[in-house]
């Protein structure tokens, strides 16, 4: 993904007929893949508590998701996705305040920034592309991902990618429309894979995120 694009996404709980509904809507199955995601944070969860998410995806490299548009309510999220390692390192040093920045890749600065693995799991994903209202441009397509994890959790996501904040409301309308056509209840909020992983395997960290969310310090439902 190009640097600085804004992801607008909504998670949902897939049903037994979700793929059939996608086919009836004219969606195209792009691929089925299996990959491992590993998330990193400090022991104090400094990144997650500020709604920043550092992930290394097997075969794809590093990705850092930062808060995007604010002030748009509802069961959806907006993130700016950073994939350039130099840009990720710059933002990590700014957030974690660890002195003079190094010129190095992400893996090389994990120790200095006291970042450690907090979650690692395997996902099997079927990824679909769907055009609405006859739109055929690549950036007008919506992506629908259906994921199942090696710890027994399944979740779906409808995603649009835009360049500017002004484009977010229109993208959100498309996401809401597709979600409705897939039979997703209007206010459904399906938890992210990472949150469910923490709830099951690191309950103390999960509780810290919930407490911060309830106090307005973090957004527990907005895990990418």
From Swiss-Prot:
Catalytic activity: thiamine triphosphate + H2O = thiamine diphosphate + phosphate + H(+)
Keywords attached to this entry: Acetylation, Cytoplasm, Hydrolase, Magnesium, Metal-binding
Gene: Thtpa
Cofactor requirements of the protein: Mg(2+)
Role summary: Hydrolase highly specific for thiamine triphosphate (ThTP).
Compartment(s) where it occurs, according to its Swiss-Prot or TrEMBL record: Cytoplasm
InterPro entries (UniProt xref): CYTH-like_dom_sf (IPR033469), CYTH_domain (IPR023577), THTPA (IPR039582), ThTPase_euk (IPR012177)
Any one cellular-component term (Gene Ontology): cytosol
Protein name per UniProt: Thiamine-triphosphatase
Assembly and interaction partners: Monomer.
Main location as per UniProt: cytoplasm
Pfam family, one: CYTH
Record-listed E.C. numbers: 3.6.1.28
Species assigned in the record: Rattus norvegicus (Rat)
Domain CYTH: residue ranges: 5-201
Enzyme class name: hydrolase
SUPFAM superfamilies, sorted: CYTH-like phosphatases (SSF55154)
GO function terms (MF aspect): magnesium ion binding; thiamine triphosphate phosphatase activity
UniProt binding sites for Mg(2+): 7, 9, 145, 157, 159
Residues that, per the record, bind substrate: 11, 55, 57, 65, 125, 157, 193
Modified residues (N-acetylalanine): 2
